Structure formats: structure tokens, C-alpha cells
Amino acid sequence: MAISSIEHRSGWYDIFDARGKKAKTIPDYIGELLGWSDRFFIVMKGSYYDTYDEQGKKIKSIPTFIGNFVSICADQFIVRKGSYLDTYDAWGKKISSRVAK
């Protein structure tokens, strides 16, 4: 199942699949939704970024000291730390780093 959208309503996040059908509902106390791709989504709770799969199952907790969240795409997300943009996968493995423009 691919994620097409995630909507926040009354203490819950509704996860919709590629056909626009509600696939899963999870409580919003998991954290503040930062973004999603078709494969996973990321929330911030306290001093951690938590990644979740399309079924709402936690993949990994990653400390926020890696940088400030910028964007998410496919199975990767980007954070900005100082003058660098670092790319991580959903499991918290750093893939690449480059100077931000």
C-alpha cells in the first residue's frame, strides 16, 4: 500500500492509500506530523524524529540533533545542520551530505 495523504482530525491521523481509501487511523500523540512520502512518514516527538511505515508501525527513532527537518521523498528525508543538507533513509542511516545553497 502506498500513502497518498495523511489527514489530522480530532486527535487522530488518518492514512489514505493510493486509491484515496482510508487505510489506517492512528492517534496523534505519536507526535507532530512533519511530512510523508508514498512509503513512510515522519513525526517529531520531543527530541526525536520517529519514522513510521504505511501501516502506522514505527520504523525508527532518530535524535533531532541530526538537524532540522526539511523534506521527505520516496524512502529518504533531508535535514539541515548548519550549512549542510544531510539525506537519511527511513531507518536513520545517513546517505549523503552536501553544502546548502
Where are these regions (language model features)?
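Short beta-strand elements that form the blades of beta-propeller/WD-repeat-like
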Residues: M1-H8, L34-K45, V70-K81
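Surface-exposed loop/turn elements that mediate protein-protein interactions on large endomembrane-trafficking
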Residues: S10-P27, Y49-T64, T87-K101
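An anionic, turn-rich surface loop/hairpin at beta-sheet edges
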Residues: G31-E32, K58-C73
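Short, exposed beta-strand-loop hairpins at the edges of beta-sheets
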Residues: F77-R80, Y84-W91
